[in-house]
UniProtKB/Swiss-Prot annotation:
This is Large ribosomal subunit protein uL15. It comes from Mycobacterium marinum (strain ATCC BAA-535 / M). GO terms for cellular component: cytosolic large ribosomal subunit. The lineage of its organism: Bacteria, Bacillati, Actinomycetota, Actinomycetes, Mycobacteriales. GO terms for biological process: translation. Keywords: Ribonucleoprotein, Ribosomal protein, RNA-binding, rRNA-binding.
Length: 146
C-alpha cells in the first residue's frame, strides 16, 4: 500500500491541546500550577530580579568618557603593504588599493610608515603619517593628499 498525502496524520500525543489553568477545580484550577502563597503565586517577578542580591547592572562599572560622533575613521595601509602589493612601483591610488583588496571601496585611506619601501612609488591617499611621507620621498616617490 502506498502512503498518500491525505492519509498522513500526526503521531499520537504530539498535538495536545493547550492547558487552560485556573478554570475550576477539575484540572489545574485554584492555584493554577503556581504552588501556594508567596510573591510568585501572587504576581509576576521581573526577569531581572536576582532575589535580593546586587543586580548585575549595578555590579558592573559605569562606562567612562564618550564616543565622538564626528570622528573620521581611516582604512590603514602601511608602506610595507604598498611595497609588497606593488613591487614594480608606479602610481598607487585608492582605486588601485581597492583593486588589490588592501582597502574597502568608498573608504578613507591613511598611509602609515610600518615596513620598508625601496621602489619609487607615487602615492595618492587621504592622509599620511610623517614617517610614511619620509619613506616615500626618500625612495624617490611623491605624496599627494586628497
Amino acid at each position: 500500500m502506498t502512503i498518500k498525502l491525505h492519509d498522513l496524520r500526526p503521531a499520537p500525543g504530539s498535538k495536545t491541546p493547550r492547558t487552560r489553568v485556573g478554570r475550576g477545580e477539575g484540572s489545574k484550577g485554584k492555584t493554577a500550577g503556581r504552588g501556594t502563597k508567596g510573591t510568585k503565586a501572587r504576581k509576576q517577578v521581573p526577569t531581572t530580579f536576582e532575589g535580593g542580591q546586587m543586580p548585575i547592572h549595578m555590579r558592573l562599572p559605569k562606562l567612562k568618557g564618550f564616543r565622538n560622533r564626528f570622528r573620521t575613521e581611516y582604512e590603514i595601509v602601511n608602506v610595507g603593504d604598498i611595497a609588497r602589493l606593488f613591487p614594480e612601483g608606479g602610481t598607487v591610488g585608492v582605486d588601485e588599493l581597492v583593486a588589490k583588496g588592501a582597502v574597502r571601496k568608498n573608504s578613507l585611506v591613511k598611509v602609515l610608515g610600518d615596513g620598508k619601501l625601496t621602489v619609487k612609488v607615487d602615492v595618492t591617499a587621504h592622509k599620511f603619517s610623517g614617517s610614511a611621507r619620509e619613506q616615500i620621498t626618500a625612495a624617490g616617490g611623491s605624496v599627494t593628499e586628497l
